[in-house]
Each structure stands twice: as structure tokens, then as C-alpha cells.
Amino acid sequence: SKIAQEVEPIVNPNTLEKPNLTIGYVPVNDCAPFAVAWEKGFFRKYGLNVKLTREASWATSRDGIIFGRTDAAPVVSGAVTNARIGAEGARHAPLCAAMTIHRHGNAMTMNRAMWEAGLRPWREYNGNLEEFGRDFRRYFDGLPSEQRVWAVVLSSSIYEYFVRYLSAAAGVDPLKEFRVIIIPPPQMVTNMRIGAMQAYMVAEPWNTRAITGNEGVGFTFAQGKEIWLGHPDRLLGVMESFIEENPKTYRSLVKAMIEACRYCGDPNNQVEVAKIITGRSYTAAKPKKCRAPVVINEDNIQSLPKCITKFTGPGIIGEYNYGGFDQQKRIAKSLDTTIFFDMPANIPQEPGEHSTFLWRSRSVWLMTQAARWGQIAQIPGNAEELAAKGWRADLYREIAAELGIKSPKEDYKVEPPEVFIDHKGFDPSDPVGYLKSFEIRANRPSQFFMA
């Protein structure tokens, strides 16, 4: 972009092992830091010449890194862990990540039939999992088995785990009561319209697009933060060999992305960021009735009408509409709808914590879920070693410190009960005990009673 070209590099590209990079992204709201790093010149500032490539799905975003088509790309938070442990037949690959792209920014959408059956947004159940479970089971019990379908963006993603976690917390066994299928984000709304699934979980703007006043095919049941407050979503994925062979380049990449995340998280920039990602090169989520230029660039971004952010704005700006089919307004204003850097005060946090910091303990949590749902036979005995190899909090600390950013001193933390929908906390020092505490899980030993 013109703005990027005017940025004076503070790192000489000739000092980098690989200054020319190909970086993937997926057309969802969390492409924002990649778009901003490119449009605002953060890549150029750190000596990088980046070509962005739009990926069709989270599978191609991950596989592009593994097969060397891209140098880096966002991956779902479970991708690095699952490539290390081979969850559900995943290709074993030494994927790494030193930073989170964002936290939150995703939601569960249910179709109109579920609304008409009496289901409502989670916030209207006032924390009553039993009541939700009754409504949920009643609806699915009335469907033939082939229609009991919930869609997510990738197998073994945190979205799949959230769908199963929610269902099990409400007393409905997700291994027996419905199927989980994989659909790329841009295809979710269309597939719901034709009845391919009853519900789905995806990043914005593909939940907002579904509600009344937009596509009108569904309503938002819950944001992901209502399942686990403060959870990580996307990570900046690379291969381990990339870090080893290009240490200076990698530091430049992480610095550029940290700065881009800080820019996206600044409330003063959120409307602009929401406008940028409506561009055809990014989400292409531009309302048809909003009069705006076909091409969105730095020359016209400030003058674009706010209606252009109808789809991308709620998740970025934090005025989130749950929708519904009863003409009632369900708009929740919050600072934590999508978190790119600074942590809102309502989220339990450690000194120095910001959203781009990776907690290795959360990689262990992902392993507990892979084991819980039968994607691996058991939690690996070397879980901490695998987490350390994949989630490079050590590198992040060093790189962030060079930017004057303090980070938490520890790699592990206890997740308190209040952040989970079922109020069951997670102590990473006892992952096996945590796994066994769940009544509903795969491979649970049968109990035999003898008179």
C-alpha cells in the first residue's frame, strides 16, 4: 500500500536470512492483524517484504505451512498441539507458535428451527445448564439421526472442543447424540440455509451474517468467551525449521505482528480496522445495500460510511448483536468481544499478561480435550515437553522484551472455575485427574455391578 511504502524500515532487509515471505490468512475477522501489518507498513518497518495469500479454510492455512507453500499463517489454537501429538490422525509435524493472534472473536450460531423449538441465547438461561440441556435434547430428539449435525471449521480445533464441552456440560453426550462436520468459514451461512447443519461455531463475521436483519438464517447462541472466558483462538504458526534457519527473520515477523495486534486492539482504531477487513482482499464482507467504493484502500478508508462495517464491526468494535426472531434487541457492548492485545479488567490475568502471550498450560488443556473425545488414546506422558516445543513462550518473552513489553514470568497457570461455563477449573499440574473428573468422555471405563 502507499502508506506502507512510506514507512522507513528500522531493520535492513539485507541483514535478514529471508526478507521475502509468503504469509497466509483466512477470510475472517482475525485476519485483521495481517491486513494491518501489510496496509500500515509494520512488515516493512521490520525489513520484511510480505505477500499475503488468502486461504480457503483452516486446513489449507495449516497445510500451507507444513508443506512449505507459505512461511507463516494463522492456525487454530489446537493445530500446533495436535500436529505434535497426532490427534485424530493429524499429520505429525513440528509446528510452532510464539504468539497468539487474538482471543475470543468467535461464536455459536443456531438455526431458526432451534429458535422456534424454544432455544435462546445462553445469556437468557442465567447459567442454568440443566434447563438448556432439556431444550437442546428435546430439539435433537425430534430429528432423524442424519440431521443431528453441528459444523465447525476444523477437526480438533478449540471450536470442536467447545461444542462438545458445552453439550456434555448440559448432560448431552456429543459422541452419541450428534455428528460434527467440517465446513470452511465463508460457507457456513449458505450451508445453514440449505439445512446441512443445525448449528455451527465459527469466527466473525460469519455469525453476525446469519442473524435477522442480515441473512436471517439463525441466531447467536453464545460467544466462545461464554464457554471459556479468556481462551486463545488463533496462533501465528510456523515450522520449527523456519525458526532455526531464520532466527532474525522470525524476530522481525513476531515484532511486526505484535505491533499490528496492538494497533487492532486500540479502541481509537477499531472502526478503521473493521473497515479495512471488509475489503475484497480480506473478508469481502461488505453489505450489498451500503454505498461504498468497490476497491477499499488507504485513500478512501477514512471516508467510508460506517454501514460498511455492518458485518465486521460487531466483533471488532464490541457492539455484539445476538439476533433472534422476536424483534427484540439483543446487543451486548463489551471490551472483550475480540481481544488483540490489552486484557480487559473482567478477565482473570497475571502480571504482565496481554493477549498475544501464549500460556503453555493451555496447550496441555487442548491435549486433555483430545483425549476426552477419543482423538488420542491418552494424555501424552511427555505433555509438558510437547507443549514447550510447540508453544514458544520463551521466544515470545525475548522478542517482546526487545519492544519494551513485559510478559508473565511463568509458562503455566491455573484456570479458575469462574472462567468456564460449567465452573470446573483447570490445574495443569494434574491433567489426568482433570480428564477423569468428567462424567461424559470417550473411552470411559465401564462399571459392572455384581450382586
Language model regions located:
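Conserved C-terminal helix/tail region of periplasmic/extracytoplasmic solute-binding proteins
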Residues: 3, 364-451
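Short, glycine-/small- and polar/acidic-enriched structural segments
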Residues: 3-181, 197-230, 419-422, 428-431, ...
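Solvent-exposed, acidic/flexible segments
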Residues: 54, 58, 101, 156-160, ...
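Short glycine- and hydrophobic/aromatic-rich loop-to-beta-strand nucleating segment
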Residues: 108-109, 235-238, 242-243
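Inter-helical turn/loop segments and adjacent helix faces that build the functional surface
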Residues: 173-178, 244-252
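Secondary-structure end/capping motifs
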Residues: 247-392
